[in-house]
Amino acid sequence: MVRRYYLSILAMVALHLGAIAQPRIEQGNTQVWYGRVNQWTVSRQILRNELNLMKECGVNGYMIELAVWDGVDDKWSNEWIVRTQKNYRWLLRECRKRKIWLFVSIINDNMGKGKYGDTGPTLEKVYESALQLASIVKRGGSKGVIVQPVAETQTPTGQRFEQECRKILENFTLVYNGEGGHPKSTPEGFHFRAVHPAHIVSSVADDALVISDHGLIIRELSIDGGLESRGNPQKVSMWVKRLQQQGVAVVGYYAFKYDKFDPATIRALGEALK
């Protein structure tokens, strides 16, 4: 009798945990994600505000670039690596508490090419340090984490880093974003492909994770046409609804270089699915 009672309790706990896990990523059941991808380390209080509102509104994923453009002078130093690990572990805990996916893009293959004001080193020059970022992700564990090793893969070094991450992160859900951000398929070893459409009205494949990581669409979805601006809720809602009708699995809004709380855009993402 006692044994049966405890078994029933365990079954109820298992059902409860399953019910509150991150939603499955699948075509025909669109979910929306948000992230201040290059400014996520600016303020933990802003992150708390964002994550709490996302949970309330049904926004199911937070997106970051681990090699963040946070304006620091010591980027790629040992001190920066340690600080990045602390920030990542904190955010990972907060996302797990709320059952929100953490989408981690480790590096961008555009780095060091001067795009959007990036004057740092190329991946080739900081390759070993970049591998330390992959190790940070590994140490955090795979639960609730989706990893894009390289954004917009386009160089031999980026391809090599991608393959090394496949080995380091073999138990993780991996996303491919090769061919400069417009992959035509999902290669072996990856679970999904992410595409970066140029415009709100750009055609995308049904099976892709659709992320607004392109200079043109970032401007189109912003309130004033800028790269460092908050979102335009009406345009964001229209974009999400269009892709939901198509049945894509994920629509992700990149708050590219915005460093403040943007509740109107987060609400627009969630309400667009209703």
Question: Which ranges hold each PLM region?
Answer:
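Extended, alpha-helix-rich binding/interface surfaces that flank or overlap catalytic cores
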Residues: 259-274
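Bacterial N-terminal signal peptides that target proteins for export
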Residues: 1-9
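Extracellular glycoside hydrolase catalytic/binding regions
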Residues: 128, 144-259, 263
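Active-site mouth of glycoside hydrolases
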Residues: 24-185, 189
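Positively charged, low-complexity intrinsically disordered regions
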Residues: 4-5, 17, 23-25, 32
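Hydrophobic h-region of N-terminal signal peptides that target proteins for export
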Residues: 10-20
